[in-house]
Amino acid sequence: MRSEQTPVLIVGAGLAGLTTALFLGQHGVPAIVADRHPGTANQPKARGQSPTIMEAFRTAGVADAMLAAAPPGRPEMTIVICDSVTGTVLHSYSEHFPDFAALSPSPGGLASQQAAEAAIATRARELGADLRFRTVLESLRQDDDGVTATLHDLGTDQRYQVRAAYLVGADGGRGTIAAEAGVGHHGRGAFGHVRTVLFRADELIEEVPDTAILMYYVQNPGLPAGSASFVSTDHRGEYVLGINDDLDRTDAEVVELIRIAVGRPDLKVELCNVGSTWEVAHRVADRFSAGRVHLVGDAAHLMPPTGGQGGNTAMLDGMHLAWKLAAVVRGDAGPALLDSHDAEQRPYGQTIADWQYVNMFERLQPDQRPDDLPEVPDPVQGLFGYRMASRAVVGGADEYGFELPTGRPGTRAPHVVLHRGAELLSTRDLFFAGFVLLTEDPAWADAGQRVAAELGVPLAVHRIGAELTDDDGTFRSSYGLSDDGAVLVRPDGVVGWRSTTIADPATLDAAWRRILDR
């Protein structure tokens, strides 16, 4: 059996796995990505990218493709509860996409998952990722030095081994890697299955408006479980029906269910793709890391789709994990840095899964709302206010929580508008490629350069008031700094350390070494 080596093997080429590969490439580390499917998503699936991940995509060269893939002229999402798409409307409301300009320089994206996966895959390949579709993981074995995986190429029917320093489990909610690594799950359980069907019905073009992104929740006793979802796509005349069970049906039976959901018994339907089923569930891994195996995406946290944060959380998992893997693989950091993946991402994944679970009742089943719903942050704090607590944060809080950015270690580095000559940019545009030191003090700038050279770790030093100007005078207050302070921002845009005192290279050296497990 042939054998090959790679620094990182990623199993699963959905949003989580592809984003991990993308940012590993951004940090100079190639990865092999294996996925059992023929290619990236062949249905629209989820839609939307939060400003927080879009900021990172700007630096990685993906944001423009995401924005270009959004359906034009749709500034809002309309949700309709009805007995059929063309029938009686029981309730409807529109959600305008909020303006987060005070918190982020990036607009949110509205690309479908299908378009997003394709864009990320293209850029990941450009940055060195080796994507292998129709490839199945058959076994894995880890030891103190790495992971050995047996892969099966379904196209050639050949089996081969890959030896990797680390394995990323991005194989979804039905994946096997978590169990093989000895990781259990907990949560509120499963609520059912959905089969998604992509179809074309030109007769609906005049009846279903394209001025908004539309989602219909159809309540009709003629449908499985008495309900279905109907969603517009990027293409006029194409729609997706979500059937609430996992039964196999003939094409004629599927067409009949579409007609019931639409309310048109004579509707002409062209089936484009009868997709596989997926599970609606609330389930979170007990650990996100087990030895040299690290979980991301649905493999780590499966959540109801109500709220649209499953994909965003998956992409954030990949971005946050990638810089840590890259730092360890390159020798910039010790292996214990990777312990922070579980310490930082598991509480966040749990919170977002809880949030989507609460949404499921508040939006769809308010009369069945259980008494023990978990407390969740408001949406703005959920997107922008997560406070991490781990050894990769120095001088922060002892426990995770939620607070809007203030420059406190463990929180998102605040967005401040700066000028570089005539160019406007954000502090957030300076991040995601490596460590960054922000300061107004030339002594701290010099200290940063010296410490980086001693550690052998790349550092971008930006002096506010020198090459970058703070014309609005908000940098210092936004970051909680004095005129002789400094902040060290990690490659994921999180404040790793902050000082409000005069320059002291030894203090920076000690803090940075702790972050990196050096």
Set out the residue ranges of the language-model regions.
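Core beta-strand elements of the Rossmann-like FAD/NAD(P) dinucleotide-binding domain
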Residues: 4-6, 156-166
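Active-site-adjacent segment of FAD-dependent monooxygenases/related oxidoreductases
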Residues: 42-123
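Conserved FAD-binding catalytic core of PHBH/FMO-like flavoproteins
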Residues: 122, 166, 170-280
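A conserved short coil-to-beta-strand element within the FAD-binding core of flavoproteins
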Residues: 133-148
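Helical substrate-recognition/capping region of FAD-dependent monooxygenase/halogenase enzymes
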Residues: 1-7, 11, 26-27, 36, ...
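N-terminal Rossmann-fold NAD(P) dinucleotide-binding loop
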Residues: 17-18
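Glycine-rich FAD pyrophosphate-binding loop
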Residues: 25-46
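FAD/FMN-dependent oxidoreductases across multiple families
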Residues: 249-309, 313, 348, 352-356
